[in-house]
From Swiss-Prot:
<protein>
    <recommendedName>
        <fullName>Large ribosomal subunit protein uL18</fullName>
    </recommendedName>
</protein>
<dbReference type="GO" id="GO:0006412">
    <property type="term" value="P:translation"/>
</dbReference>
<dbReference type="InterPro" id="IPR005484">
    <property type="entry name" value="Ribosomal_uL18_bac/euk"/>
</dbReference>
<dbReference type="GO" id="GO:0003735">
    <property type="term" value="F:structural constituent of ribosome"/>
</dbReference>
<dbReference type="GO" id="GO:0008097">
    <property type="term" value="F:5S rRNA binding"/>
</dbReference>
<dbReference type="Pfam" id="PF00861">
    <property type="entry name" value="Ribosomal_L18p"/>
</dbReference>
<comment type="function">
    <text>This is one of the proteins that bind and probably mediate the attachment of the 5S RNA into the large ribosomal subunit, where it forms part of the central protuberance.</text>
</comment>
<keyword id="KW-0694">RNA-binding</keyword>
<keyword id="KW-0699">rRNA-binding</keyword>
<dbReference type="GO" id="GO:0022625">
    <property type="term" value="C:cytosolic large ribosomal subunit"/>
</dbReference>
<comment type="similarity">
    <text>Belongs to the universal ribosomal protein uL18 family.</text>
</comment>
<dbReference type="InterPro" id="IPR004389">
    <property type="entry name" value="Ribosomal_uL18_bac-type"/>
</dbReference>
<keyword id="KW-0689">Ribosomal protein</keyword>
<keyword id="KW-0687">Ribonucleoprotein</keyword>
<comment type="subunit">
    <text>Part of the 50S ribosomal subunit; part of the 5S rRNA/L5/L18/L25 subcomplex. Contacts the 5S and 23S rRNAs.</text>
</comment>
Length: 119
């Protein structure tokens, strides 16, 4: 009998497939998303140098909303975009981390776009 693959393992395999094609450069770094059950995290990464340029999450001190809902995800997107623009980053490559582009991941992306990031 075949064993059913867990959702987490499937997401990790999808993420590896996506990462083969997505690569962040100093001119156009990668906006990476991680979604846990209660929080959401976003970081902008320069893969060429292996450096995280900017990071934001629903656990930050500046963050006052709830991180487990869409409104919180949108605020995290706006926060990471604001910090990126302060560092001089305006264009990024979006890495959804193997998650479906729906719900909190979509809201984070839309919040970052509204705050001025281009992808």
């Amino acid at each position: 009998m075949f064993k059913k693959q867990s959702r987490q393992k499937g997401r990790e395999k999808r993420h590896l497939r996506i990462r083969k094609n997505i690569f962040g450069t100093p001119e156009m770094p990668r906006l990476s998303v991680y979604r846990s059950e209660k929080n959401i995290y976003a970081q902008i990464i320069d893969d060429l140098n292996g450096v995280t340029l900017v990071a934001a999450s629903s656990l930050d001190k500046e963050f006052d909303a709830k991180g487990s809902n869409k409104d919180g995800a949108k605020l995290v997107g706006e926060l990471v975009a604001k910090r990126a623009i302060e560092k001089g980053v305006t264009k990024v490559v979006f890495d959804r981390g193997g998650y479906i582009y729906h719900g909190r991941v979509q809201e984070l992306a839309e919040g970052a776009r509204e705050a001025g990031l281009q992808f």
